UniProtKB/Swiss-Prot annotation:
Chain segments annotated as transmembrane: none
Organism (species): Bluetongue virus 17 (isolate USA)
Recorded name of the encoding gene: Segment-7
Gene3D superfamilies in alphabetical order: 2.60.120.170, Bluetongue Virus 10, subunit 1, domain 1, Bluetongue Virus 10, subunit 1, domain 3
UniProt GO BP: fusion of virus membrane with host plasma membrane
Pfam families xref list: Orbi_VP7 (PF00897)
Signal peptide: none
InterPro entries reported in the protein's UniProt record: Capsid_hemagglutn, Orbi_VP7_capsid, Orbi_VP7_capsid_C, Orbi_VP7_capsid_N, Virus_capsid_a-hlx_vir
Protein name per its UniProtKB record: Core protein VP7
Glycosylation sites: 287
Function: The VP7 protein is one of the five proteins (with VP1, VP3, VP4, and VP6) which form the inner capsid of the virus.
Keywords: Capsid protein, Glycoprotein, Outer capsid protein, Virion
Gene Ontology annotations for the cellular component aspect, listed alphabetically: viral envelope; viral outer capsid
Cell compartments where the protein resides: Virion
Entry's family note: Belongs to the orbivirus VP7 family.
Length: 349
């Protein structure tokens, strides 16, 4: 299936170079389109031309690219338009070894297949405590019963620790059971002035320390912590104290948008509004997948099928921009006039 996806990308990108009818095509583009169009026309009985000039010819070429995109991703879109019928035989065209594919397309598909079949350490974009169910007021003393050291979450990437005079304790537990981190990068600071439960202000005296694995860490400097070594706080002074510990970022095996080059841009290209026809077409295609049909996914896609849907669909969007096809989509009423931000915004409601 990798070669089929690579051929689909190659042919669609070749079609996206047809910016004008009199353009001088590169030799490899002529070879790719010549073989692909000949095979496609022979199997589907369509009349795609290499240099589309009329609206009907542009539509035929776009429908060929749409067939290839759907075949490469294994999507059966069904009856979405009175002007278009999906040709299942297109998979046979893409399986033809005579159709060349570019090194770039092959490398991109290989990267997707390789990255989605394994896991690796990645810097996570969300706060370490993002999914916590409760939070505490920053800078306000809080001590649980029968404790001398209490750590609480006070933000999506922040905890604060309240310490009694002379108290020492391990705050590692508050990090446990969250996000399965491989490495956490911390910065700790003294909370110079904080409010006691009664509302009076109190100062944290110098001398409070935070240590990792028994080694004192300097305040205000990034600390690399594996989540396993003891994370101790110590207040050797004769007054209550508070410290703040911020998770600058952390690394885990969760997939991110960095797993594939320009994945963020590809997602934006897919979900961008071009006109109501494209908006309806994209929605109809994504309705047959696990991806959201209108707005980008909340979390990065982490499976091969999803990424190999987004990549060809993004290329199809480029082809749509270049060929400017005009056809009907069931349930879509195109709005005449120039595209404005208000029109695009209204389409997502």
């Amino acid at each position: 299936m990798d070669t089929i996806a690579a051929r689909a990308l190659t042919v669609m990108r070749a079609c996206a170079t047809l910016q004008e009818a009199r353009i001088v095509l590169e030799a490899n583009v002529m070879e790719i389109l010549g073989i692909a169009i000949n095979r496609y026309n022979g199997l589907t009985l369509r009349g795609v031309t290499m240099r589309p000039t009329s609206l009907a010819q542009r539509n035929e070429m776009f429908f060929m690219c749409l067939d290839m995109m759907l075949s490469a991703t294994g999507i059966n879109v069904g009856p979405i338009s009175p002007d278009y019928t999906q040709h299942m035989a297109t998979i046979g065209v893409l399986a033809t070894p005579e159709i060349p594919f570019t090194t770039e397309a092959a490398n991109e598909i290989a990267r997707v297949t390789g990255e989605t079949s394994t896991w690796g350490p990645a810097r996570q974009p969300y706060g370490f405590f993002l999914e916590t169910e409760e939070t505490f007021q920053p800078g306000r003393w809080f001590m649980r019963a029968a404790q001398a050291v209490t750590a609480v979450v006070c933000g999506p990437d922040m905890i604060q620790v309240s310490l009694n005079a002379g108290a020492r304790g391990d705050v590692q537990q508050i990090f446990q059971g969250r996000n399965d981190p491989m490495m956490i990068y911390l910065v700790w600071r003294r909370i110079e002035n904080f409010a006691m439960a009664q509302g009076n202000s109190q100062q944290t005296q110098a001398g409070v320390t935070v240590s990792v694995g028994g080694v004192d860490m300097r305040a205000g400097r990034i600390i690399a912590w594996d989540g396993q070594a003891a994370l101790h706080v110590h207040n050797p002074t004769q007054q209550n104290a508070m410290v703040q510990i911020q998770v600058v970022f952390y690394i885990s095996m969760d997939k991110t948008l960095n797993q594939y080059p320009a994945l963020t841009a590809e997602i934006f290209n897919v979900y961008s509004f071009r006109d109501h026809t494209w908006h309806g077409l994209r929605t109809a295609i994504l309705n047959r997948t696990t991806l959201p049909n209108m707005l980008p996914p909340i979390f990065p896609p982490n499976d091969r099928d999803s990424i190999l849907t987004l990549l060809p669909l993004s290329t199809l969007a480029d082809v749509y921009t270049v060929l400017r096809p005009e056809f009907a989509i069931h349930g879509v009423n195109p709005m005449p006039g120039p595209l404005t931000r208000a029109i695009a915004r209204a389409a997502y409601v």
